[in-house]
Structure formats: C-alpha cells, structure tokens
Amino acid sequence: MLKKLQIVSLAAAVFASPLALADEPALALTFKDPSLKWGPCPEFIPKGCEIAVVHGDPSKPNVDVFFKVPGGFAIPEHTHTSAERMVLVSGTLEVTYQGQASTRLKTGSYAYGPPKRPHKATCANGAPCVLFIAFEEPLDAMPAPGAVK
C-alpha cells in the first residue's frame, strides 16, 4: 500500500508541473498591434528608433522585443551583453558584425548575433525596418568602444 501511495505521489508531482506552466497565456501578435507600447531606444541611437517589449521583463533574462527604425536609418555600432536571435519582419537591413562581411537581411531573414560582438546596421530607403529580437540575458545596448557618437 505504501509503495502504491509513493507511486501515485510521484506521478502527481510529475504531471502537476506542466499544469502550472499552463497558467501562462499564449501570445500572438504583429508589430502593428495597437496594444504594443513603443518607446525610445538608448540615447546613443539617433531619434527615430523605437522599441516595444513583446514578452518578458527587460531587466530579466529571456526578453523578446520589436525594434523599429525608419527607412534610410543608420544604427550606430554597439554591443549587447546577450546573444541576439533576430527575424526581420519588415524592410531590408544591412548588418555588419565586426570582423565579418556585411549581410543584407530581407523580410523573413533570421540572424544570430553573438554576445558582446560589435555591430552596426542600415535600413534601406523606403519601408521601415522592424526586427523581432529574442535576448537571452537582460536587455542592454552600449556604444561599441571607439564608435563614432
């Protein structure tokens, strides 16, 4: 009887954990969703850049954001503590990581940015560029050492 009780208790613990996760609601939206709260980017990035938190807390690990700049906008060289996993959802963006050739991202392109690797980008003239970015670590952005301000 005791053995059956232990097995039932173990099974209850194993199956209860996924139920706790089920309390978190699923989320689906686009960068045009009116519920998004767009705010300014860090001061070293010129005016016109906007960021909206999609999921998570920017001061904690695992935060997702939309990052938006107008067509023709140059994003200065900068770094992040975290790796970045990005999908371009609008526009055409040329990205250059220090020590690598430039890459032209088109809508739907995926890009990975290693942590602390200096990079810069330019949005092509025309449509705004909007990136979905998933950060592993808390959200930050700093001008790259020696970057033109």
Residue ranges and their predicted role:
Residues 16-18:
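N-terminal signal peptide c-region/cleavage motif recognized by signal peptidases
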Residues 21-63, 146-149:
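A short, N-terminal "cap"/entry segment at the start of jelly-roll beta-barrel domains
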Residues 27-31, 120-149:
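Double-stranded beta-helix
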Residues 63-80, 114-116:
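Conserved short histidine dyad/triad with adjacent acidic residue
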